[in-house]
């Protein structure tokens, strides 16, 4: 089975938005004031932090994260990170997992906008996350309310210590003026700005993974629901990156072999007003974009001629019958 979601009590932004600090998408730790005990790159590892008893290296106890030496002077340590995409940040996770006697008492995050790979010395940094008290061996979820899109972050540790993981959840910003008329764009791609509105069940894997680039690495890299023991079906609602006319749909069940859905269908609508929460009820009555279609294991299923002519839409509801796993969902369309 896919690994269960580690923290079911995590805020909604951790399931809705992409991790802009994911190195698989292009994020990079550029510079750190110190990384004596553990390199800065480990802080961005997309996998959960682990602890290996008895593992040591030339610098001491091996730790899964970024860890600086004990500071014996004034000041604090910091690390500059280039985000995978310019984006608006809605929340962060400062994770000190397995750091107990060596975590920072506090941390903050600054942000800037720069066209350069590494921000210049005169870059203007703004406070994104003010100084926040940290505790050992736990996640620290911080909401962010700042509408500006940033390209780089500076993580400050006060005064030193170790940070297991940095997650930066946000919505990428794309220059849509460069999209050619009639060009097919994946309107469900998370890197284009699409996001998950809601899903009725995400027991074995969050539905937002369906919107990630590339094919799934394994069965854990996708949306998987628990086994349904009652009538009905499972579903997920996606807000498209831009309003558009959907011309082609791809439903990928990569790595799902004994647990793929028997069938799928799609509903869609152009929504104006309301909130994400209000869409859950409305979506039950949206018109059908794609009637029920059979699915097979470990395959990309492409639908074009089967799509209804609904015109421009902003949201889609994927129904899987009755349950199971979907690795990726691609909604190729023309911008409205």
Swiss-Prot record:
Top-rank taxon: Bacteria
Keyword GTP-binding carried by entry: no
Biological-process GO terms, alphabetical: allantoin catabolic process; purine nucleobase metabolic process
The protein's Enzyme Commission number: 3.5.3.4
Pathway recorded for this protein: Nitrogen metabolism; (S)-allantoin degradation; (S)-ureidoglycolate from allantoate (aminidohydrolase route): step 1/1
Gene3D superfamilies, sorted: Galactose-binding domain-like
Signal peptide region: none
Reactions listed under catalytic activity: allantoate + H2O = (S)-ureidoglycolate + urea
Key word Hydrolase present: yes
Keyword vocabulary terms for this entry: Hydrolase, Purine metabolism
Database matches in Pfam families: Allantoicase
GO molecular function per UniProt: allantoicase activity
Family listed: Belongs to the allantoicase family.
The protein's name: Probable allantoicase 2
Organism encoding this protein: Burkholderia pseudomallei (strain K96243)
